[in-house]
Amino acid sequence: QYLKKNYPSLYLVSSTTKVLTDFNDLQRELARPEFRYVVPDFRLNRAFDRLAALPQSQKDKVEFLCNECCWFGCTERRACYEAVSRKNLGLPGPEHYCSAPGAADGYRFSRAMANPGFIGIKAIRDTYLPKGFTQFKIEGRGLGSALILEFLLHYLTKPEYQLTVREELYLDTMLDLF
């Protein structure tokens, strides 16, 4: 109530950190009026039949995570998010060591693009928008400028202009990308 009273324009998002992998859990979360958006686990990104059956009011609340790099078969996602959250808050707790294939390599956009849950531009345009979905989330704000640039080029720049934009940015000595 404090937030509603003092910050009336603030909206709440049910985060991907809840790891909503069960579609029924997603539907229950979408029915909660306090959330403007609900981010399902990336493994539900391709549940097209069930997603398409949602009423438009719920479709408007779904915010898809497009470029998740986490292994599709991961069973430790919740523990990972909890450890990261504790660390960000400066709280004590057990460290999480990811045991997924390729985890030691860190985030790789190429690996994210090969993930079955990946949503690229073509899928947004040809599949999700026609089904009534309009909210998409790009992961990685803390991954570094060069990687964020690649996300922005992929999602916001026509392919024929990507190299030109990349060169202009990389060759601009005023920018500190690396």
Language-model region placement:
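Active-site pocket-lining/capping segments in soluble small-molecule metabolic enzymes
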Residues: 1-25, 29, 35-178
